[in-house]
Amino acid sequence: MTLQTFKSTDFEVFTVDGLEERMSAIKTNIHPKLEALGEQFAAYLSKQTDENFFYHVAKHARRKVNPPNDTWVAFSTNKRGYKMLPHFQIGLWGTHAFIYFGLIYECPQKVETAHAFLEHINDLKTNIPNDFVWSIDHTKPSVKLHKTLETNDLQKMIERLATVKKAELLVGIHISPEEFSAMTNEQFLAKIESTMQSLLPLYALCNR
């Protein structure tokens, strides 16, 4: 049986008012799909890397007043968490689905990873697909399209990862609700797989 992924109507969960109400809608409608994606792609990443990957569905446990504007499942090699490690994500905002690889501010490997990325910056500029996007803050939906960046722009983002304590850097794709409505489950799963394939060389640079 084909894994049931998101529907275009799932984006509407972020229009539900109130913390408890929105969290209830996320837990009912989104979390089961994130769990299923987590199982499938933790196994996929484990096979691709010969490492044990674990998945972590966002719980939003720290939220006491404001409801979440996005939700996700993350993949790392630590069974207890992902924020301290380079990791992959699949998730939703109200405006798009996303598939990312990156490092957020809690990760202690940021300086070493930034140096590795800088050493291979020309490869990154050339080999990352033009329709991929870069994010410097996982809590905001705004991104920069890879094809619009000069090598110098990319260099500045990577250098910031090394020099700014709260800096983050994620790269991957966005899929709009309109694009999503035209995709089958199989096409979405294939898109996740192809995106992760394009991002695995960056993961390898983090672990050289």
From Swiss-Prot:
It comes from the Bacteria. Signal peptide: none annotated. Disulfide bonds: none annotated. SUPFAM superfamilies: YktB/PF0168-like (SSF142913). InterPro entries: UPF0637 (IPR009403), UPF0637_domain_sf (IPR053707). It holds the Pfam family DUF1054. Belongs to the UPF0637 family. This is UPF0637 protein BCAH187_A4079.
